[in-house]
C-alpha cells in the first residue's frame, strides 16, 4: 500500500478574503509538501492533484523547480487543466468584462477591499453547466411533484461547495481561462519565480473522464504537451467525479488505453483500446515503481513534532459555505 496524506480544501471566511494565488501556492501546497517530507522522512514523495487542486499542485512544483528542487517522485493529475485552450461550456461564463467585474468587486482592485466568491454562486454556475440533470430535474421532481430527492453521494458532493478568496479567484480566471498563460514557459511569475511546467522532472500520469462537463477530456489531454518527461494519459468513462471514483471491486464502466501520445486527442482516442472495468489498476501498476521500498506502516499518525490534531476528516471538511 501507500502512506497517504490528504490536504483539505479549507472553506475561507472573511478573515481569509484577501488571500492570493501566491498564498495558496506558497503557504498551502508548498507547505504541505514540506510537512509530508518531514513526517515521512523522504526527500521525494508521490503527489496527486484533482481538478483545480491539480493546477495548484503543478504550479507549486514548477515554483520549486525554479528554486532547484524536485520533491515529486511522481505527479498524478486527475481531471486537471493546465492548457486552457479547450474549456467547454465554461467559456460562456468567462470573458474580459466578466473578469474585470470580478476584479473590481471582490479582487484586489475593489474599492471596498477584497471579498469572497460565495460558494452558493459557484455551485449554481456548475449546476447550470448541466441544467437538465442538476437544475430542471429537481424543479420538476421536488418543486412541482413534491418528491424528496433520493440520497446520492455525488449529489451531496455537488451541493457541498466552498467560498473562494476574491484575489485568488480573479488571478485564476484571468491567467488561465481568459489568457491561457500557465502553459507558456516564463510568462507568469508566481511566488517570485518564473513558471515553467516543463521544468518538472517527475513522471506524470494524467487522467480525464470522457463525459466530464467541467474539464473536457480533450482539454485535459492538451496537458500532455506541457510536460517534457515521461507521461501517460488515461481516459475513463463517465463524468468529473463518477469517472474518478470507480473502485475495481464495483466492476463498473471502462477506460481507454494508448501508450502513444499523438498531438491530437482525437487521434489518441481513435487508436486507443477500450478496457472493461476501473482505470485504478492501471494507475496502481504505474505508481508502484515510484513508491520506494516497502516499510512497516506507522502505528499512529504524525510524529513527535507533528502531532495529530483531531480525528479525520477534520473540521475543515465539515465547514459549510
Predicted feature descriptions by range:
Residues 38, 42, 56, 60-169, ...:
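Alpha/beta-hydrolase-fold enzymes
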Residues 49-57:
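Gly/Ala-rich beta-loop-alpha elbow adjacent to hydrolase catalytic centers
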Residues 216-226, 237:
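Short alpha-helix in the alpha/beta-hydrolase fold that links the catalytic acid
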